[in-house]
Amino acid sequence: MIYLIIILLKFQKNLYDLLYSVIIKEDYLRNINGILLLDKPIGLSSNLILQKIKKLFKAKKAGYIGTLDPIASGMLPIFFGDATKFSDYLLNTNKWYKIKAKLGEKTNTLDSFGKIICIRPILNIKKLNIEKILSEFQGEIYQKPPMFSSLKHLGKPLYKYARQGIYIPREKRKVYVHYIKLLSFSKKYFSLTIKCSKGTYVRSIVDDIGEKLFCGAHIVKLRRTKLFNYKESHMIDSNKLYNIKKKFNDLKKLDECLLPIESIFKKLPIIVVNDDIINRLRNGIKLNFWKIKKNNLFKIISKDTKKFVGIIDINKYGRANSIKLIK
């Protein structure tokens, strides 16, 4: 009987702790809006660092675009609150990388985080050999996604199949490399800079270069330096964020690290409307903008508050095709 009472008391305590944590969590989390250009550290998955940053900011809603491999560092855009509505406008933008690769070794993940599966001699490779091969990867190319990737097959990421030793056939996909340039070359290593389209696997490019050099190659360092119009200088690393939190113990100081949502749309033409029009748009009322005779995406600015409230796609007949507004 005593044991039964103890079990019931433990169950009651666990249930209380669970309910308490859920209630506190909901009250504790904040509705914040903005974009953090995180300098992702090496060794963590993009999703894991997202959860850490979300917890640090005590944010109710957050997401990211442009997955970076655990080996990679650099720009990982994290979107908070209403900013998540507009993240898809960065999905198809170009990305810039700096890469360091090692010759003579091929790994199962195509980077140094994997297992070496083949070692071959490096035979008389010259700088000109590499530069000539690089020219073959400029422009429109077709590449097969690596098995160790987050690309899904039947709802399951490919890397999970790879870890189980299951091979999944993949079709080649078209990507675009705007430029690829050799930065340095030594006997065992070479460094590149590359600007490429969405969906480009730079690990696969390095692996293909290694095969064309008949010795194999894999990435040992990978850093995303730029995405869209955001530059490397705009990034902030997680250590700095934690230091800000520790020093000031003020979430508003962390919020100062966020870029406004409208930073995505700096180059868009502006349409200024009063709050009455904005409220009608919020309520789903279709309006015509007869004075606009050009098919374009516009940034909406409130005439009353002078603040960004969303974007609207207007066709050449002055009709709104689509609208996205912040709350």
Curated annotation (Swiss-Prot):
Highest taxon, organism lineage: Bacteria
Enzyme superclass (EC): isomerase
UniProt KW keywords: Isomerase, tRNA processing
Annotated catalysed reactions: uridine(55) in tRNA = pseudouridine(55) in tRNA
Active site: 69
EC number: 5.4.99.25
Binding site for substrate: 97, 201, 222
InterPro entries recorded: PsdUridine_synth_cat_dom_sf, PsdUridine_synth_N, tRNA_psdUridine_synth_TruB, TruB_C
An annotated Gene Ontology molecular function: RNA binding
Pfam families cross-referenced by the UniProt entry: TruB_C_2, TruB_N
Function: Responsible for synthesis of pseudouridine from uracil-55 in the psi GC loop of transfer RNAs.
Stated family: Belongs to the pseudouridine synthase TruB family. Type 1 subfamily.
Name of the protein this chain belongs to: tRNA pseudouridine synthase B
